[in-house]
Every structure is written in C-alpha cells, then in structure tokens.
Amino acid sequence: MERIKIGITHGYTNGVGYEVILKAFEEPTLLELCTPIVYGSPKVASYHRKALNLSTNFTTIQHAEEALENRLNIVECIQEEVKVDLGQKTEEADRATTISLDAAKRGLAAKHFDAQVMAPGDKMSTAEGTTILINERTRVALLTDNISFSDVSKHITSEEVSRKIADLDRCLKRDFALSGPRIAVLALNPEPGEEEENIIKPAIEQAGDNHIFAMGPFAADTFFGSQAYLHYDGILAMYHDQGYIPFQVLTNEYAIALHSAEDGETLTAAPLEDAQLAIAGKGEANITSFCNAIYTVTDVLRNRERYDEAHQNPLPKLFHDKREDNRRNPHAEAQNKTEKEK
C-alpha cells in the first residue's frame, strides 16, 4: 500500500522550522508512517543541518511526483540564494516563507500530496471550513475567527451556530471516529442574554432534532474552571479568545490546529508555536507538536477512508415494515383496519 504523502512548508528560515523538520525525520519512525515532501530550499536545509550538527539525510527533487518513500524529500521551490540570519526578521526570510506557502498551496490544490503540515511560524488560512484546536485533553472549534471582538455579535446567527455544530459533529465522527460525540456550546455572554436565548439555544435545539448531542450554552469561565470540558468530545466557542486562551492555559507541547476545508477533503495541520526566533540555531526546539500534527493528519485520513467506506454501502434494513406494504397496496390498510375493529 502506498504511504500517505504529507506536504510540508518550511516555516521561517531564520527560525526553528528546519530544525524541527530535520529532527523529526532523523529517526525512521515517521518515515515508516508517511512520505514527507518539504517545499523549500535544500541549501537552507543544509545550512541548518550543519549548524545543528544533525545527520538527517534528504533528497532534492523538482516536483512532488518525484518523492521517494523512506526519504525526506525537499522540493526545490526556492532557486535563489537565501541568506540565513538566525533569530532575525528579514525580508529574505519573509519572501522565502511566502514562496514555500504558495508552492505548497498549489501542490495541495493539485493533489500532489494527501494532507499538509506547516512548520512552526507558518500561519494557516482558516477563511473557509472548520478549524479545531487539539491537544490530548480536548478539541475546541471556533465559530468566528480573525475578526475584532466588536464585530463578533454581528456574525453570530442561529443559522451559523447550527451550521458550525453540524460541521463539528461531522468532523468528530468522520475525522476522529467518534460515535455519538458530545458537543458543548459556549455562551457569548458571561450571563444569559439575548444572544443565548434567541440565537444559541434554538440552534442547540435544532441540533437535537437532527440527532446531534449538543448541550449549552455554557458560560466559558465556569465551564473551563469546573473542568466540565473533560466530559465532552468537542467544544464550540463563539470567538477566538474565548476558545484559544483557555485552550492555551490547559494545553502543553502536544497542541496543534487542524483545518478541514469546506470540501471535506483538504486537510491542514500546524503546531501552535511561532517561529521561536529566540532559540533559533541553538538546538532547543521541541518537535512534539510537529510530530503530533503528522500523526493526527495520518490518523484523520485513515479514519475518513474507513468512515466513507462504511457509509457508502449502508447495511440493508433487517426488519419488515408493514407500512411499506400498505403504501404499495392501499387495500391492505383498509383490511388491517377492519381486522382491528373486529
């Protein structure tokens, strides 16, 4: 069976991106799980490898289709020389980051690989689809993101809350193989107000009508403070800080963001760390979140395959419904009625 192909952006060239990538694939464990395809610069990779005294081997390729299994592959999408100035923000590093992101984006759209993982420092686009913050304790989805707090209430409608609950439910079932997942929906206000009563509650009730187990709305402070989050498979927060801040407080080195596009297929994961310029070139970067992102996307892809296969040909109905006979034979219904009257 062909291994899953993972497209990887190289992060900020003056940060810890290449350190994390080279360390992660220094041992064969991840190479046995997937075929990594880094969009970047072999010369910059060699610079970091030498500076950090690492022994990771990689293969330089020009196109993702040339990627070899059991090897770290680097697509040479940056042809020009890139000066590495560890720990510094520079225009060259900014440009190299953009080139890598754009090349990986094109590769993902062209299906040259199965999923994308970003190195620390790269920002994923969350404009469309569902983004979930994941650690070993919980999963938090955001109703709104990248908008000012003053505009949040304008984006909270009953239709949007209903849609996000349904998206999260589908994601938990298909991506994480959870049967009947429990979803907690957070309130917008610390005390129940108009939004909770007229917008969020009706959306939760509609979810129940659609056989989705959603509860709430819960005030965020008491919900996280009482550790109620431990009893739910997923949480829907109304805005960025409401979900992100408690998640960061509760999380540790395993934290990642997972984004599933609206098409239900395009998948991107990223560790939550930034470029970590302060420790660039010192060999102190932690690879746990990056590795967790790799593990997560491979698990999700396999779960999706199993889920889609199971739901493609559902089991036939194992009982006989007399009502179906009545619909086909209207005289049968009259006969049943006569027998009951006797």
Where are these regions (language model features)?
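Anion-binding alpha/beta catalytic cores of soluble intermediary-metabolism enzymes, centered on
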Residues: 1-342
